[in-house]
């Protein structure tokens, strides 16, 4: 790869398949605007063709459980350009045939989303400004003061003024409700989310009791309350094998150089 060809360098991710349908996310750097361009490509008659592209970024495609509908995240690309002060606008859209409808929209980042096993709901993980910081117009120029500096950082950069939330979206009515409130529980970020028999389990970061570092925890949502089932390790990438919950990571925090492992709960 020569320097003059860097504009053509793309990375591929989020490959999804259903029957003979394939969709993949392609991301490249646009150096003139200093921003990432993310598009969706679809396999059609043996050839890859652009499925979603334009002035917005498109990412994280998923096929519906019981139909041929396609979901994806659409993000205002100006959000990626830090020199612009436009508010973030992220939404999940659903394409059914040639019809496109907005399923969920938020002023903030959509980190991931999960289709319920019955196909009736979406569970959306977001990263939003906390209540105290949300109404500050020029957030980049606002000074920030910290009594403690946590050891770990998440991938979003300014984590101290962000909170992770989970919304439940009814695909039939279009209505949504916040089922995990990051402001209430002081959740800095949410990494992984799974559902089994209608019960949500997720891994998340929050400050320890002294406020000196971030701790990874795994919690289950029961009657709108978070019940922690694992607190001493560094776990993420939750998944079910059969009806048993598994996680990828370390049994004990900072247990280096122990190899990453898969643990069954």
Language-model regions, residue ranges each:
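Predominantly five- to eight-bladed beta-propeller fold
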Residues: 38, 80-89, 127-167, 214-217, ...
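Beta-propeller domains
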Residues: 25-50
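Short glycine/acidic-enriched loop and turn motifs that connect beta-strands
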Residues: 28-32, 76-81, 129-132, 206-210, ...
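Solenoidal tandem-repeat scaffolds enriched in leucines and small polar residues
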Residues: 130-134, 158-216
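Multi-bladed beta-propeller domains
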Residues: 1-11, 41-59, 85-111, 169-189, ...
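Conserved beta-propeller blade repeats
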Residues: 8-22, 55-73, 79, 107-125, ...
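A generic tandem-repeat structural signature
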Residues: 67-99, 133
